[in-house]
């Protein structure tokens, strides 16, 4: 049977045509299973899932350049049994099994060949298995993965107990949703939705400019990485209180923190941030497996250096308005706005924030102890996507922050710094939510180091004079995180040249964006000359550590007086 694709499926098919053979949109899950597993019952449960959900028998095939869903009447997803070599100890077995799981997660799918799902059972011992499940995003999303795993567990339990499984009836299939979605997005409803988004995004920037480790290539790839950190339980609790006080959700609070951190990196007060929302608007869709997510383009304004609470209110209102108009498929929006199309970056949105996206569903099998194993495909859909989700740790709830980042642009250290800055900013915002964004520190007091030598002191003095910030400056502070931008970097390089006779490329500031890093570059430069600014250096050499600290604070105070005047 041939059916129309949904708008989201259409976009994924197009991306697959553009860069075939990529695992970017693979959704992997894996579970360590300890106990007497009935592998045959697990296979029967998987067969029942394929029979129940037509989308698991679906491929996406192009006919004359137009993709369609092709649904097979029957199908099977065999669980591949992988026996590990003999003679390995438990640690080696674990490493080997998890290595195979990663390989399975990264194997691409051919969208024209159903099923777009693969499973494997890696045998690491008589009662020890690693179950791997990989589904392509074109037929599944995060909530659908939970449905699949929950129902797989329910049928397995029924099979091992010798009773029929009790599952909610399906009154429609995903193909019906795709037909309904296309019928809905026509005429007056389409005009109403487009009218809102046209007005909301009028004049919005098409590109988020972030200081990167490398120039943006002419054609982006899906190479990516994953970085993770945690917001501690105390800060999470304080942020929950901030959310209650602002009559908003934790999603809004963390989205505000993400937007605030971006604003300290990007030289623009107007930013588009994407977020994923569910298009399950009717109860009949609740038990279905399929791709029901849509992307909203949220326009964030950091103009006039708002306090965190003020920005929180802006984000809350922006999000509420967007959710009231969430039915317009992102693909329709892009087609209507027709931004400049380029292979260098994704259209409209290069940064995204999602809340709760990494919560792992759990296999619940009788007599089996289950432990989830998170797998990464080492890919990135955008320049950066930050996920936040509640995470239990030592009987307390913390918040896990994970960043999927483009390896075309950023190194792992860049991603770690960004998450660290975001975490510190949130900690200070939780303690003093009325603080203006520019005054929220992004380094902890322990991380902030005062200049340790005359070169660092000189660069810090220049820095303080150029940057529009009232926050203290340390040698590990990031120029761009403090509000610097391309023009600031250009002026900084010129001032450094005046002081030391070195001609640094402006790009060096992007590559080495801290005082400590730049001081090392300046001192190692072949044209470095202490005589160029000898009087200044002699003066600095004579200063004690306390005097250097006072000099920097005086420069900072002078800068603040100019701002307030």
Where do the language-model regions lie?
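Acyl activation and transfer enzymes in specialized metabolism, enriched
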Residues: 34-57, 133-150, 225-267, 282, ...
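C-terminal lobe/hinge of AMP-binding adenylation domains
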Residues: 27, 45, 55, 134-136, ...
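A short N-terminal helical cap/helix-turn-helix that marks the beginning
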Residues: 59-60, 152-172, 200-209, 322, ...
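Phosphopantetheine-dependent thiolation modules in NRPS/PKS and related acyl-activating systems
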Residues: 66-70, 74, 173, 427-436, ...
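Acyl/amide activation-and-transfer machinery of modular secondary-metabolite enzymes
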Residues: 8-34, 63-88, 103-104, 113-118, ...
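Acyl-group handoff/entry surfaces in thioester-processing enzymes
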Residues: 2-75, 88-184, 192-193, 199-211, ...
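Flexible, P/S/T/G-rich "lid" or insertion loops adjacent to the active sites of thioester-utilizing
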Residues: 15-24, 168, 190-248, 338, ...
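His-Asp-centered acyl/peptidyl-transfer active-site segments
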Residues: 20-26, 54-55, 127-128, 182-194, ...
């Amino acid at each position: 049977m041939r059916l129309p694709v949904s708008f989201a499926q259409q976009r994924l098919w197009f991306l697959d045509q553009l860069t075939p053979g990529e695992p970017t949109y693979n959704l992997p899950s894996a579970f360590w299973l300890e106990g007497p597993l009935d592998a045959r019952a697990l296979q029967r449960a998987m067969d029942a899932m394929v029979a129940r959900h037509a989308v698991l028998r679906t491929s996406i095939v192009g006919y004359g350049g137009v993709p369609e869903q092709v649904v097979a009447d029957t199908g099977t997803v065999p669980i591949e049994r992988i026996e590990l070599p003999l003679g390995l100890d438990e640690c080696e077995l674990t490493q080997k099994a998890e290595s195979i799981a990663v390989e399975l997660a990264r194997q691409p799918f051919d969208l024209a060949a159903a099923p777009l799902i693969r499973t494997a059972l890696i045998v690491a011992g008589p009662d020890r298995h690693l179950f791997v499940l990989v589904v392509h995003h074109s037929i599944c999303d995060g909530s659908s993965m939970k449905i699949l795993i929950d129902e797989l567990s329910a049928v397995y339990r029924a099979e091992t107990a010798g009773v029929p499984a009790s599952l909610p009836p399906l009154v429609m299939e995903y193909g019906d949703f795709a037909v309904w979605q296309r019928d809905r997005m026509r005429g007056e409803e389409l005009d109403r939705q487009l009218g809102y988004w046209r007005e909301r995004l009028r004049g919005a920037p098409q590109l988020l400019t972030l200081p990167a480790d490398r120039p943006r290539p002419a054609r982006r790839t899906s190479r990516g990485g994953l970085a993770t950190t945690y917001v501690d339980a105390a800060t999470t609790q304080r942020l929950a209180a901030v959310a209650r006080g602002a009559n908003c959700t934790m999603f809004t609070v963390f989205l505000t923190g993400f937007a605030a951190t971006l604003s300290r990196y990007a030289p623009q007060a107007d930013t588009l941030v994407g977020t994923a929302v569910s298009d399950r608007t009717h109860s009949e869709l609740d038990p279905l497996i399929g791709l029901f997510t849509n992307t909203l383009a949220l326009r964030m304004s950091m103009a006039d250096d708002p306090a965190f609470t003020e920005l929180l209110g802006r984000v809350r209102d922006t999000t509420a308005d967007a959710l009231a108009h969430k039915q317009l498929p992102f693909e329709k929006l892009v087609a209507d706005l027709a931004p400049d199309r380029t292979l260098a970056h994704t259209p409209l949105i290069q940064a995204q924030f999602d809340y709760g996206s990494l919560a792992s569903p759990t296999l619940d099998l009788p007599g089996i102890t289950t432990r989830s194993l998170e797998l990464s495909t080492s890919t990135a859909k955008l320049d950066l996507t930050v996920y936040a989700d509640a995470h239990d740790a030592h009987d307390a709830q913390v918040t896990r922050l994970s960043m999927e980042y483009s390896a075309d642009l950023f190194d792992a250290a860049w991603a770690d710094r960004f998450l660290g800055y975001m975490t510190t900013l949130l900690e200070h915002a939780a303690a003093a939510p009325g603080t203006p964004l520019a005054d929220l520190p992004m380094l902890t007091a322990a991380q902030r180091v005062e200049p340790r030598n005359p070169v660092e002191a000189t660069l810090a003095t220049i820095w303080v004079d150029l940057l529009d910030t009232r926050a203290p400056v340390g040698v590990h502070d990031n120029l761009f995180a403090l509000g610097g931008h391309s023009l600031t970097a250009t002026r900084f390089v010129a001032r450094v040249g005046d002081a030391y006779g070195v001609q640094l490329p402006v790009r060096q500031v992007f590559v080495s964006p801290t005082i400590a890093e730049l001081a090392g570059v300046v001192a190692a430069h072949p044209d470095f000359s202490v005589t160029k600014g000898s009087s200044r250096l002699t003066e600095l050499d004579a200063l004690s550590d306390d005097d250097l600290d006072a000099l920097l604070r005086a420069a900072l105070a002078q800068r603040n007086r100019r701002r307030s005047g």
